[in-house]
Amino acid sequence: MPNEVYDVTIIGGGPIGLFSAFYSGLRSMKTKIIDAEPAVGGKVRYFFPEKIIRDIGGIPAITGENLVANLKEQAETFHPTIVCNERVVDVTRLTDGTFQLITHNGSIHFSKTIVIATGSGTFEVNKLEALHVEDFPLAIHYDVKNIEQFRDKVVAVSGGGNSAIDWAQTLEPIAKQVHLIYRGEDFKAHEESVRELKNSRVKIHIHHEIHELFGTNNQLAEISVICNQTQATKTIETEALFINHGVKVDLGTMAEWGFEQADFGIVVDDEMKTTVPGIFACGDSATYPRKLRIIAAGLHEGPIAINSAKKYLEPTAADEAMISTHHESFIG
């Protein structure tokens, strides 16, 4: 029903939003997820479907695709309403305290509370800027769904963050050769990942940037890279390019919703409350002192936000849900 009112609407269907939906089910809250993308999973679904994630407790290693599938299955335990391809552009509090959410296509949703789990917002990858990029559209990759297509090929990765290093390490045992091109010197990645990279077969080109692409019939054969210290150039053989130059993020109209924001997200307290009563934030959407930006931390923040939403609606409710092993939904 279009005018149905939900106890909580979670804006964002990435890993944190999905787990928050599961936890809200434990709290018997009528739940809706609204996501701007065609499918749930957030940046993990888009950027990391075949990459291995290793920083979630109890899961030594899992692909992004499998993590999203597991979280979606878990989220659906209590049958939340999931709406995709809708970006929330306006939130208004009605006279009865209910929030009215309007999406970009004019759809209207109603909710008693809101949990923002949009990560850094909607995103657009930063594209490679180099000569003749337009001649090799099939050789330039910003996300990869099947790494087997690069088996026994020479490939190059451009970037210096965790994502670039993860891709270089993922491709290293599959590709004939992997080149990592980075315009800086000090990688912006986990120390252990950098150590493993330097001990691998990956050829590292620091202080270099991609300048020009070469090939025939739209088949990439070589790239020219330039040293930003000496301006010297060199040619690297490669059949495919992986570009990890970050993303442009857009919080859209959230800046107009009335809550306090800082450089790295929406300001929350230790209960994930924003400065607007009834609106909560978690995951990369939220910021507070000593914030840890990993999935495992967000999976902790989501339930805190849901518990706060529950207490907002029912001040006498229990502070937290019964643990799942004792929950009536999983007994008998």
Curated annotation (Swiss-Prot):
**What are its cofactors?**
FAD
InterPro entries membership: FAD/NAD-bd_sf (IPR036188), FAD/NAD-binding_dom (IPR023753), Fd--NADP_Rdtase_type_2 (IPR022890), Ferredoxin-NADP_redctase_2 (IPR050097)
Tell me the superkingdom of the source. Answer: Bacteria
Cofactor, how bound (note): Binds 1 FAD per subunit.
Residue sites binding FAD per the record = D35, K43, F48, V88, F123, D284, T325
A single GO molecular function term of this UniProt record: ferredoxin-NADP+ reductase activity
Write down a Pfam family by its short name: Pyr_redox_2
Q: Per the record, what are the reactions this protein catalyses?
A: 2 reduced [2Fe-2S]-[ferredoxin] + NADP(+) + H(+) = 2 oxidized [2Fe-2S]-[ferredoxin] + NADPH
List its EC numbers.
1.18.1.2
| Record's keyword terms, sorted | FAD, Flavoprotein, NADP, Oxidoreductase
Q: Which family does it belong to?
A: Belongs to the ferredoxin--NADP reductase type 2 family.
The protein's matches in PANTHER family, at most eight in alphabetical order, are given as: THIOREDOXIN REDUCTASE 1-RELATED-RELATED
Q: Which HAMAP family match?
A: FENR2
According to the record's subunit comment, the protein's assembly and interactions are: Homodimer.
- The protein here is known as Ferredoxin--NADP reductase 1
Question: Which organism does this record belong to?
Answer: Listeria welshimeri serovar 6b (strain ATCC 35897 / DSM 20650 / CCUG 15529 / CIP 8149 / NCTC 11857 / SLCC 5334 / V8)
